[in-house]
């Protein structure tokens, strides 16, 4: 399944790619799509299983993670700081 993560900073996006959570593969950094606003403008597109969960961001850099669905996006994780 495809996912998109947005970040508070470019450093956070680069760090996510370098220190990817377990089960995350094929990470591509790219501009954030318009319908997913982001503070820094950089997102990470990646693959993970349908059972992928993300409950805690120890770096506090991730703004949100969404799953790409047929109807749009489903929020998997949203920062409590958002």
Model-based region annotation:
Residues 1, 26-47:
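Amphipathic, hydrophobic secondary-structure cores in small proteins
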Residues 4-6:
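A short beta-strand micro-motif
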Residues 9-12, 45-51:
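Helix N-cap motif at beta-to-alpha junctions
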Residues 15, 39, 54:
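Short acidic, gly/pro-rich beta-turn/loop elements at beta-sheet edges
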Residues 22, 37, 58-61:
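A generic structural signal for short, non-catalytic loop/turn and secondary-structure boundary residues
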Residues 48-82:
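C-terminal structural segments of small proteins and small subunits
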């Amino acid at each position: 399944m495809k996912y998109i993560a947005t970040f508070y900073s470019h450093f956070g996006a680069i760090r996510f790619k370098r220190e990817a959570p377990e089960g995350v593969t094929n990470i591509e950094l790219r501009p954030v799509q318009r319908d997913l606003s982001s503070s820094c403008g950089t997102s990470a597109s990646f693959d993970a299983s349908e059972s992928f969960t993300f409950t805690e961001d120890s770096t506090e850099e991730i703004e949100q993670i969404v799953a790409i669905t047929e109807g749009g996006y489903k929020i998997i994780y949203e920062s409590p700081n958002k």
